[in-house]
Amino acid sequence: MENIQTKQYPCFKRWSRKNWSVFASLHRYVTIGVLSVGMSILLLATQGASAQTADTTAVLKTLRIREVGVTGSQTAPARNAQSHTPLFDRKAQAPAPVQTLEAALRLAPSVDVRERGGKGTQADIFIRGGSFDQTMVLLNGIDFTDARTGHQSHALPVDLDCISAVELIDGVPGVGAYAGAVNIRTAPLRPTYLRLEASGGQYGYGYGNLSGAVSAGRFSVLGAASYRRSDGYRHNTDFSNYNAFVRATYDGGRAGFFDLQAGWQDRDFGSNGFYAAYNPDQWEHTATALGSLRWLKTAGRFSLGAAASYRKNFDRYDWTRGTAMNRHNTDNVGAKLWADCDWAAGVTTVGGDYAFNHIYSTNLGDKLSVPEGHYTHAKARHTGNLWLRHAKRWRHFDAAASAGVSLTPYGTSALWSLSAGYAPAAGLRLEAGAWQSMRLPTFTDLYYTSPAQINNLDLTPEHAVTYRLGMDYLKRSWNLSAQAYYRSGRDIIDWVWREDMGSKWHSEQ
C-alpha cells in the first residue's frame, strides 16, 4: 500500500452537470474511474461504469456512504424538487418476495397503495394522506398523469424486471403534484442480456415476460414485452394484461444526449365490486399508448434541456358486463424547456412547461353538436408553468428557492418553494422546506353523472402549502431517517353523500 502514489487517486472537484453538490455534502473525496453518461444523466444501470477499465484509480477501501439520487435540473420532474425518498430499489429489495410494482410499493411507509383485484389489476397511489387524484405519476422523469382520473395514471406498461428504482419526490410547486410525485425509473439488468420468465398458478393464472438490452458504444436500448392473465378467484375477477415497452438512449456528442421511450398496454378485467360494492358484474377495458423524447446539451457552464411527451388512453366501462355504459378517449400532451447556468453565486435555472388535455367521452365534457362516433361529449384545456430557481451550496450548508406562475383556465397563480440543508457533522444532515402546490379538478370531478352521482361544474383548483422537516443520520451500517410533514390545504375536492339531492354522491369543495 505504501507504494501507491497520490496521483493514482484523482479527487472529485467538479461535475459538468452541475449537481455535484450531492457529493460535496458527504465531506469526503470521491474517487471515480469512469463516469458513464447513463449514470450521470439517467441513472441507468451502473454496470456501464464498472465495465470500463479503471486504470487510473486504485481502490484502497470500500466505504458505505449515504445513498444519494444524482438528479440535475435536467431530470427534475417539473419546476423544482426538494427531496427524493427511495420507495423501491432493485438491488436492495431483490430478496423481497414481490412480483409486481404494487406489491413492492406496499413495503414503503410513505405511500398507501390500494389494489382492486390481484397482480396489479387496478391500483391507486396515495401519498401522505392525499388522494390518488393528488399524485403526480412520472416515468423516467416524464409526467404521464392522466387528466380524466387518477385511477388511470398508474396504468403504465412496465413490469417489475425493468424497474430499477421508484422514488417519492417532494417539493414540486405549481400544478400537478399536490401531495407529491412518484417517479418510476427503468434500467436494464445489465448492459447486454436476454431474459425469459414464465410462471403459472391456480385459477388459470399465467405470466410470461421477454426482456433484453443491447449496448454498443454511445447507444443503448432496453425492451420488454409481457402477458399476464387469470380466470379469477371468484365470480367476475378474471383479467388479462399485455405490456410492451422500449427505451433507447444515444450520446450524440456535440449534438447532445437523446432519451426516447415508448410503451403500450392493453388490459381488461372483471370489476366485481370495484366501483360499487353491491354490483358484482362490472367490467372494464383500457388501452394506453405513451411516448416521450428528451434532449440534453451542455456547453461550458451552460446547459439546455427539452422534452416532449404524449399519452393516449382508451377506456370502456360496463356497469353490467357486455353492455357498454361509459367510453372515454383521452389525449395528454406535454412539453418542457429549461436552461441552467452555473456561476459563482450558484446554479440558476429558468424554464417552463406546457400541458394539453383533451377528452372525447359518452358523458364527460361539453355536449357535442355532432357526435364523434360513440362519443357525444368533449372537453379540452391548456395549462402551463413558468419558473426561476436558484441554488447555492457552501461547505456545510445549502439553500434553494424558486418562484414562478401557473397558468390555467382558472386564472394565474403564483408558485414558489424554499429549501435548506445543514450538515453539522459527518453522516448527519438536517433539512427544512416549504412549497406551494395545486391540483386542477379532473374531468371526472367536473362532469361525471350516474344514477348514484351528480357532477359539479363550479369546482375550482385545490391549493396547499406543505412544510417539511427532516433528519438523516448514517454511521457505519446504521441509517436513521426521520421526517415531519404538515400540509395546509383549501378548496379540497371530494365526493359527499347528499340526501337533499336525491341521496346521491356530489362532488364538492
Language-model segments: residues:
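Outer-membrane beta-barrel signature, preferentially recognizing the C-terminal barrel domain
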Residues: Y275-T298, A423, R429, Q436-R490, ...
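Extracytoplasmic beta-strand/coil segments of soluble accessory domains associated
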Residues: E102-I142, S164, G171
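Surface-exposed extracellular loop regions of Gram-negative outer-membrane beta-barrel proteins
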Residues: A213-R229, G305-D318, T349, T362, ...
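Flexible loop and strand-edge segments within Gram-negative outer membrane beta-barrel domains
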Residues: S230-N241, D251, A255-N332
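Short strand-turn segments of transmembrane beta-barrel domains in outer membranes
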Residues: A165, P173, G180-V214, A225, ...
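Transmembrane beta-barrel strands of outer-membrane/channel proteins
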Residues: L196-G200, G223-Y227, L260-W264, A306-K312, ...
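N-terminal periplasmic "start-of-domain" segments of outer-membrane beta-barrel proteins
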Residues: T62, R66-Q99, A123-D124, F132, ...
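Short acidic/polar hinge/loop motifs at secondary-structure boundaries
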Residues: I142-G171, R185
